């Protein structure tokens, strides 16, 4: 099993932490296991509560059903259904930025 370093950051929320996340675990789940409190609601990729923005790196969020192609191209990611596929940095708490 491969594990990646995922940096979660949001200056306004006081978050600047790096977690280890296996490539078969959702980023939200890994963050919670490591004591990081991130927003979530459905945990199924069907809403935008957990939205973040990918600053660097790559993720697999093929399980999501909410974001459109343009939002994905802009780097938005649903942490509840995103697996890291490389080391990455995610700006958290980005639900409002979607609209």
Curated annotation (Swiss-Prot):
Signal peptide: none annotated. Binds 1 [2Fe-2S] cluster. This is Ferredoxin. It is found in: Plastid, Chloroplast. It comes from Cyanidium caldarium. Its cofactor is [2Fe-2S] cluster. InterPro entries: 2Fe-2S_ferredoxin-like_sf, 2Fe-2S_ferredoxin-type, 2Fe2S_fd_BS, Beta-grasp_dom_sf, Fd_pln. Pfam families: Fer2 (PF00111). NCBIfam families: fdx_plant. Belongs to the 2Fe2S plant-type ferredoxin family. The lineage of its organism: Eukaryota, Rhodophyta, Bangiophyceae, Cyanidiales, Cyanidiaceae.
